[in-house]
């Protein structure tokens, strides 16, 4: 959830409501939102990005909890004012860089990434294939798969897992089918221009090696609300 309102009992927008709200904004604008900045915790996950794919071109956010200081708005707004015609992808990459610089030397653990949602279908297709392969492998490789989960960075009471790190752990397993689909996902998660992950960075030992995008992967019970998401 995002946009908590302390004046109404802590009400907030969940992922389904966020999709509806932004679809309404797009209807008013007559086009997609160029860039959505989410200065909030845990927002750059695959399920959130999938919810927003029809409303937003580029999103910037963190896959972990953000410090209370949040974004360096003075620098970001100054950049936007100085370069009003800068395209969304370029500005998003700059925001990621500026955010990380603002926490350098402050003993904070942070992540930030920019996602081009026009490229999300390719990654979701790779996830679909990986999911099917994992299900088929559970009978023979449940313990190695569980070990790969445990060795991957997890966030929010272990409910979210870094997608890239998990794929890299799966790539080490003996099952050739799993290794192949994990390798394909790793390639799809490579950051750069024209890719889903335009840019990503992190500071802190706890997030070393993370790739800028998480996925919901709890260790036991799945939240019933998850089934109502587009993903």
Language-model-derived ranges and their functions:
Residues 1-231:
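Terminal, contiguous helix-loop blocks that mediate binding/assembly
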């Amino acid at each position: 959830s995002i946009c908590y309102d302390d004046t109404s009992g802590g009400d907030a927008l969940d992922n389904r409501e966020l999709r509806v709200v932004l679809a309404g904004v797009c209807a008013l604008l007559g086009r997609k939102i160029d860039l959505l900045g989410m200065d909030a915790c845990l927002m750059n996950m695959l399920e959130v990005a999938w919810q927003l794919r029809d409303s937003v071109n580029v999103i910037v956010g963190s896959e972990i909890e953000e410090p209370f200081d949040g974004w360096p708005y003075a620098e970001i707004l100054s950049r936007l004012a100085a370069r009003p015609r800068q395209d969304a992808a370029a500005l998003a990459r700059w925001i990621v860089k500026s955010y990380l610089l603002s926490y350098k030397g402050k003993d904070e653990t942070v992540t930030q990434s920019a996602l081009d949602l026009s490229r999300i279908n390719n990654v979701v297709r790779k996830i679909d294939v990986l999911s099917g392969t994992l299900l088929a492998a559970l009978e023979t490789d449940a313990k190695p798969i569980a070990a790969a989960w445990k060795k991957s960075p997890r966030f929010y009471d272990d409910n979210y897992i870094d997608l890239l790190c998990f794929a890299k752990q799966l790539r080490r397993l003996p099952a050739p089918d799993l290794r192949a689909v994990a390798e394909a996902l790793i390639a799809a998660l490579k950051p750069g221009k024209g890719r889903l992950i335009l840019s990503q960075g992190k500071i802190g030992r706890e997030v070393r090696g993370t790739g800028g995008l998480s996925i919901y992967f709890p260790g036991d019970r799945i939240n019933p609300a998850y089934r109502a998401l587009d993903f």
